[in-house]
């Protein structure tokens, strides 16, 4: 396990998870709306 320094691991996991869910959500929403192909 690498040392994260001042940044707690749970914070990285929370931000990373939220960002991943947002990207996936926008991808499916864009595909459903018909504009996902333009991305």
UniProtKB/Swiss-Prot annotation:
Where found? Answer: Plastid, Chloroplast thylakoid membrane
Looking up Pfam families in the UniProt record yields:
PsbJ
Q: GO annotations under biological process?
A: photosynthesis
Enumerate the transmembrane spans: 7-27
Alphabetical list of InterPro entries matching this protein: PSII_PsbJ, PSII_PsbJ_sf
Could you name the Gene Ontology cellular component terms for this entry?
A: chloroplast thylakoid membrane; photosystem II reaction center
Q: Keyword Transmembrane helix, does the record have it?
A: yes
**Bilayer topology term:** Single-pass membrane protein
Q: Which domain of life is it from?
A: Eukaryota
Q: Which UniProt keywords apply?
A: Chloroplast, Membrane, Photosynthesis, Photosystem II, Plastid, Reaction center, Thylakoid, Transmembrane, Transmembrane helix
Q: Which SUPFAM superfamilies does this entry report, sorted A to Z?
A: Photosystem II reaction center protein J, PsbJ
NCBIfam families cross-referenced by the UniProt entry: PRK02565.1
| Complexes and interactors | PSII is composed of 1 copy each of membrane proteins PsbA, PsbB, PsbC, PsbD, PsbE, PsbF, PsbH, PsbI, PsbJ, PsbK, PsbL, PsbM, PsbT, PsbX, PsbY, PsbZ, Psb30/Ycf12, at least 3 peripheral proteins of the oxygen-evolving complex and a large number of cofactors. It forms dimeric complexes.
What is the documented function of this protein? One of the components of the core complex of photosystem II (PSII). PSII is a light-driven water:plastoquinone oxidoreductase that uses light energy to abstract electrons from H(2)O, generating O(2) and a proton gradient subsequently used for ATP formation. It consists of a core antenna complex that captures photons, and an electron transfer chain that converts photonic excitation into a charge separation.
Query: What protein family is recorded?
Result: Belongs to the PsbJ family.
Name by which UniProt lists this protein: Photosystem II reaction center protein J
Which species does this protein come from? Rhodomonas salina (Cryptomonas salina)
